[in-house]
Amino acid sequence: NISADWPQPDTQEGISIVDLTNYPLDNPGTVTVSRQDVMLGGLLLVNEWHSRPSDFDESSLVSIMTYARSMGVTKSIWRNSDQRLFPVAANALLDALNAAKEAGLEGYVVREAYRSISDQQTLWDAEYNRLKGRHSAWTDDELIAATKKSINLPGTSEYNSGLAFTLYLYENGNDELNKMVFSESEQGKWMYENSWKYGLVFRFPLQDFPTKGTVSRAYKTGVNVEMNLFRFVGIPNATVMHHLDMCLEEYIEYLMAHPHIAVFEDGQLKYEIVRQQVGDDSSTFSVSISRKTSNYTMSLDNMGGLITIYEY
C-alpha cells in the first residue's frame, strides 16, 4: 500500500508519522457526502470558540445503561438511566472498561455524559443567577465572565457533543474504593495511559493533571478546571494525538498545517489521514478520496474541514 515515491518512516519500531502534504492521493476518486453523515465521525470540535453546529442531530444518542446491558454488561457503570452518548463513544467506553477489567481494575462509573442545549441553559442560568444574587453591583459582562469559569455557554460545552463523558470510582459497600481520588487511583492511571488504544483521549490536560509532568493546554481548550473527561475521537486520531502529545485543538491545527499524513506502526502502513476544506455552508459536498482501500471513515471538524481516515 506504500507508494514508491513516499518518504520512508523514520523508524521500523513503534509509531512513525510521515508528512505527505506534497504528495497526491493514490488512485484518486470523488464521492458526494452529506454533512449529517459525517457530523459525528469523532473530530467535531466543540469549545468556547466553536459552538456546536445548528444542524447537529441528537436522534441517534443511546442510553448508556441500555446500550451496556445489550452488550452483556451487568455491572452498573452508569450513574443514572438518563445518561446518553452516541454509540461510537459508548462502544469505545465499554471497550476500555473491558480492557481495564482484564487488567484487574473495576469500579468505573460515568459521572456525566451528554447534555442537551436546554440542560446546559438550565445549568448556565442557575450559576448566573447565583452569582447575580451575591454580586448585585456586577455588570452583565462581569457576570457572564464569572459564570464561564464553571459552566460553558450552551452549545460550547464538550458535554454537548455526545462524544464525551467524565468518570469516577464507586462500588456499593467498597468504602476504600469510594474514597479514592480518580486521578490518584490505579484505575485512573490505567485509563490515562491506555484510553487512546480504544479511541478515547483525555480532553483537558492541565499543569501536572491528570499526571505529574502533564503540560497545561488550558490556553487551547479554554478549560481550566480539573475534570476526568474523556472524549471519543476514534483509534487512528487518538493514536496520533497520543504519539504527538496533542489536545484536540492542537491536532486539528496540525492537520490544517499537514493535511495529508501517513501513520506507520513497526514499519507497516496503518493509517492515512487527509483533511480537506469543505466549508460549513453546504448540506452535501464533493470529496476527493483514495480508492486504494474502501475501509475509511470521515468526520467534520467544525473548522470548515472534513477529515478522512483510511485504515490498512
Region spans (language model):
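Extracytoplasmic cell-surface/polysaccharide-interacting catalytic and binding patches
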Residues: N1-Y312
